[in-house]
From Swiss-Prot:
GTP binds at residues 17-24, 85-89, 139-142. Pfam families: EF-G_D2, EFG_C, EFG_III, EFG_IV, GTP_EFTU. It comes from the Bacteria. This is Elongation factor G. Keywords: Cytoplasm, Elongation factor, GTP-binding, Nucleotide-binding, Protein biosynthesis. One of its GO terms (biological process) is ribosome disassembly. One of its GO terms (cellular component) is cytoplasm. Catalyzes the GTP-dependent ribosomal translocation step during translation elongation. During this step, the ribosome changes from the pre-translocational (PRE) to the post-translocational (POST) state as the newly formed A-site-bound peptidyl-tRNA and P-site-bound deacylated tRNA move to the P and E sites, respectively. Catalyzes the coordinated movement of the two tRNA molecules, the mRNA and conformational changes in the ribosome. The gene is fusA. Belongs to the TRAFAC class translation factor GTPase superfamily. Classic translation factor GTPase family. EF-G/EF-2 subfamily. CDD domains: EF-G, EFG_III, EFG_mtEFG1_IV, EFG_mtEFG_C, EFG_mtEFG_II. HAMAP family: EF_G_EF_2_B.
Length: 699
């Protein structure tokens, strides 16, 4: 099957925003105007096309990345836009990061009322890290308190990359009629009766001409600063054509020197078509970007793949989902080469050959079967046994693309199936969830036998429990959310472990002496082999390390994992006949426990970065409450009538905070929180936690 459009007419874009900035609504309008849907889906009616999980329809938030292909004609040429819709809620930021890897460009949506919000700043930093070009859309211009110029200034001050306005609004709040195009110097008014499908291009009203002229000058100055030739023309007072400006702005956007800024109101159907034009005009096609780099797993050499159908096949699995009818769906972005339905691919990450069954072009939750997928394209594959982050390629030309690092879960909860018959089904479902979501884990407590699920926040786990019930019919009882505490040490200590077992026949002998010392917070674990003169044979050194690591899974204070420790193995002894791998594992484990007792062990807890937005009059109450939760206020910022309070608060104190905040602010306060770092638990609180944990273990 030939391509629908040539690769240079392809745009792979993400739509990224803070929760409630109107991202899904904007996506819905794009699908409507590109002819993909015949009725506009409203989020608050629970009918949005891209939000297709029942939990999303109920909560009005986007949880999974849905991807869809649509087409747009610009200057008589047909383009394909693959849209990856991403969630704005902090518990799901893993979805955003995972999709960044496969995007060529991003539309960042900001609310004209709330401006640049914390989650948008975090996502912008991720876009910087993945070097993704972007354009900005200031949405909700029809809302009370909308202010394009204030938000533009916030983008300029808070985010990297210089913004350049290519439109300004025609009116604001309930007077918002349309936009002024600063390139063409025309006003665009949308016709309400056509649901915004039709608009008229008219002369700029006299009262806006001066402002438009001022902002056009700013736009030209900003663009020519990125292009020496145009700068020369500009300084000589020569006329610069619209074509030249667009070309220079495209180049500067792709090189991440500028971010074009547009505005509108997706809900009121205003501003979406020019946004689509800007996606075509300024965001890159796969061939406008540098080739992808990876490593050859056989040789360790660097490999490069250019976005061409003639190169060896290479694709990245960026999302895995289970579908009740098709089984596992693996979403892939093809970076080079082509893949035919039914052919074999090499999963370089797992080092195995796999068969790609059917290939599906996805439109939110409906699908179209295709026979071949080519370089630059995105599709879902049925029948692959891949996990998120796997590289799929041609076996003769193996390559592994950089694997993403995901944060460890910070919260856990005990669950048990309500009926015995669901026990086995539950473990299959949990395995599926772990494949789909790298920040979700399921484990069994070795002492109590309880099943524990671990995730990035309360909402994350709630939704997983909800999915068990809705998608698989498994009802579970849930325990109270638990904090993922850890343990560490404060000082150096030496520990000795000796394991001698003499029973009839061959005995066991292992003997290790180690020194442990604290590492900086977040540094993890280091093991140093400092054995001289063969007092422990080389083959048993890894056994000691394995034993140490095993002991670190169960700290001596309360059985929590031990982190941020350097272990130096420097002495010990062995027996010619009785020494074995298992004996040295036990010796390593005993040595660590011995040393840890003397090393001033302490309990660590996850500290969350909390940002609360509240009307000014409730600030005192909100701060008082955060202080009572052992919070440290890190700073405050005024945004008109709203105050943003930034604080570091222990996760243990944040359960049920949403309800408290609602009552403190009469429902007007909002907050987001994300993991920041681990810190020591104050002694009297640590004693209480250790006491409760030990009581729980003995009961």
């Amino acid at each position: 099957m030939a391509r629908e459009v040539p690769i240079e007419k392809l745009r792979n874009i993400g739509i990224v925003a803070h929760i409630d900035a109107g991202k899904t609504t904007t996506t819905e309008r794009i699908l409507y105007y590109t002819g993909k849907t015949y009725k506009i889906g409203e989020v608050h009616e629970g009918a949005a096309t891209m939000d297709w999980m029942p939990q999303e329809k109920e909560r009005g938030i986007t949880i999974t990345v849905a991807t869809t292909a649509c087409y747009w004609t610009r200057n008589g040429e047909r383009y394909q836009i693959n849209i990856i819709d991403t969630p704005g809620h902090v518990d799901f930021s893993v979805e955003v990061v995972r999709s960044m890897k496969v995007l060529d460009g991003i539309v960042f949506i900001f609310s004209a009322v709330e401006g640049v919000q914390p989650q948008s700043e975090a996502n912008w930093r991720w876009a910087d890290r993945f070097q993704v070009p972007r354009i900005a859309f200031i949405n909700k211009m029809d809302r009370l308190g909308a202010d394009f110029y204030r938000v533009f200034k916030e983008i300029e001050e808070k985010l990297t990359i210089k913004p350049v306005a290519i439109q300004i609004p025609l009116g604001a709040e309930d007077q918002f009629e349309g936009v002024i195009d600063l390139m063409e110097m025309k006003a665009i008014r949308w016709l309400e009766e056509t649901l915004g499908a039709k608009y008229e291009v008219v002369d700029i009203p006299p009262e806006y001409q001066e402002k438009a002229q001022e902002w056009r000058e700013k736009m030209i100055e900003t663009i020519v600063e990125t292009d020496d030739e145009l700068m020369e023309k500009y300084l000589e007072g020569q006329e610069i054509s619209i074509d030249e400006l667009r070309k220079a702005l495209r180049k500067a956007t792709i090189e991440r020197k500028l971010v074009p800024v547009l505005c509108g109101s997706a809900f009121k159907n205003k501003g979406v078509q020019p946004l689509l034009d800007a996606v075509i005009d300024y965001l890159p096609s796969p061939i406008d970007l540098p080739p992808v780099k990876g490593t050859n797993p056989k040789t360790g050499e660097e490999e490069v793949r250019h976005p061409s159908d003639d190169e060896p096949f290479c694709a990245y699995a960026f999302k895995v989902m289970s579908d009740p009818y098709a089984g596992q769906l693996t979403y892939i972005r093809v970076f080079s080469g082509t893949l035919k339905a039914g052919s074999y691919v090499y999963n370089a990450t797992k080092d195995e050959k796999q068969r790609a069954g059917r290939l599906l072009l996805m439109h939110a939750n409906s699908r179209e079967e295709i026979q071949q997928v080519s370089a630059g394209e995105i599709c879902a594959v049925v029948g692959l046994d891949a996990a998120t982050g796997d590289t799929l390629c041609d076996e003769k030309h193996p390559i592994i693309l950089e694997k993403l690092e995901f944060p460890d879960p910070v919260i856990s909860m005990a669950i048990e199936p309500k009926t015995k018959k669901d026990q086995e089904k539950l473990s299959q479902v949990l395995n599926k969830f772990m494949k789909e979501d790298p920040t979700f884990r399921a484990t069994t407590d070795p002492e109590t036998g309880q099943i524990l699920i671990h995730g990035m926040g309360e909402l994350h786990l709630e939704i997983m429990v909800d999915r068990m019930k809705r998608e698989y019919g498994i009802e579970v009882n849930v325990g109270k959310p638990q904090v993922a505490y850890k343990e560490t040490i404060r000082k150096k200590a030496i520990g000795e472990g000796k394991f001698i077992k003499q029973t009839g026949g061959r005995g066991q002998y292992g003997h290790a002496i180690i020194e442990i010392e604290p590492l900086p917070r977040g540094a993890g674990f280091e093991f140093i082999d400092d054995i001289h003169g063969g007092v422990i044979p080389k083959e048993f050194i890894p056994s000691v390390e394995k034993g140490v690591k095993e002991a670190m899974q169960n700290g001596i204070l309360a059985g929590y994992p031990v982190v941020d420790v350097r272990v130096r193995l420097f002495d010990g002894s062995y027996h010619e006949v009785d020494s074995s791998d298992i004996a040295f594992q036990v010796a390593g484990s005993l040595a660590f426990k011995d040393a840890a007792k003397k090393a001033d062990p302490v309990l660590l807890e996850p500290i969350m970065e909390v940002e609360v937005e509240t009307p000014e009059k409730y600030v005192g109450d909100v701060i008082g409450d955060l202080n009572s939760r052992r919070g440290k206020i890190m700073g405050m910022e005024n945004k008109g009538v709203i105050t943003v309070i930034k604080a570091h608060v222990p996760l243990a104190e944040m359960f049920g905070y949403a309800t408290t905040l609602r009552s403190l602010t009469q429902g007007r306060g909002t907050f987001i929180m994300k993991f920041s770092h681990y810190d020591e638990v104050p002694q009297q609180i640590a004693e209480k936690i250790i006491g409760e944990r030990m009581a729980g273990k003995s009961s």
